[in-house]
Regions:
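Conserved acidic carboxylate
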Residues: 9
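Acidic, metal-coordinating helix/loop segments flanking the phosphotransfer/catalytic sites
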Residues: 31-49
Length: 123
C-alpha cells in the first residue's frame, strides 16, 4: 500500500507540480489549499507525512503545526515545512515551531524523493 502524503499549499501551480512528482514516485497525494482545511483533513484521517507551506491563508503553517502536534492521532506523523522563508533563522524558527523537517523552495525535484523517503523512515 502506498504512503499517503497531505500537501498543504495555497498556490495551485505548486500543488500541481508537487502532486505530479509525488504520484510519479508512487505516493497517494491529498491536498489542502489553506491552513484550516489542512488541519481538518489531517485530523480526520492522519496521513503518513505532511508537507506544508508556512505562509498559508487563514492560519499559517506554524499554527497548523502547533494544533496538529496536540492531537493524539497525529503522534508520529512527520510535518515538513516546504517554504520560501530562507532568511537567517527561518529554518531554526520552523523547527522550533514543531516541524520535523524543512525543504526550501524552489524545490529541487531531483532531490525531493530522497528527502521524503528519509522523513518517512524516521517515523
Amino acid at each position: 500500500m502506498s504512503k499517503r502524503i497531505l500537501y498543504i499549499e495555497d498556490n495551485p501551480e505548486n500543488r500541481l507540480l508537487m502532486r505530479r512528482v509525488l504520484m510519479a514516485e508512487g505516493y497517494t497525494v491529498e491536498e489542502a489549499s489553506d491552513g484550516n482545511s489542512g488541519l481538518r483533513k489531517a485530523s480526520e484521517s492522519p496521513p503518513d507525512l505532511i508537507l506544508m507551506d508556512i505562509n498559508l491563508p487563514e492560519i499559517d503553517g506554524y499554527e497548523v503545526t502547533a494544533r496538529l502536534k496536540q492531537l493524539p492521532n497525529m503522534a508520529g506523523v512527520p510535518i515538513i515545512a516546504v517554504t520560501a522563508n530562507v532568511m537567517k533563522g527561518d529554518r531554526e524558527k520552523t523547527l522550533a515551531a514543531g516541524c520535523d523537517g524543512y525543504i526550501q523552495k524552489p524545490i529541487d525535484i531531483d532531490l525531493l524523493p530522497s528527502q521524503i523517503e528519509s522523513f518517512l523512515k524516521k517515523e
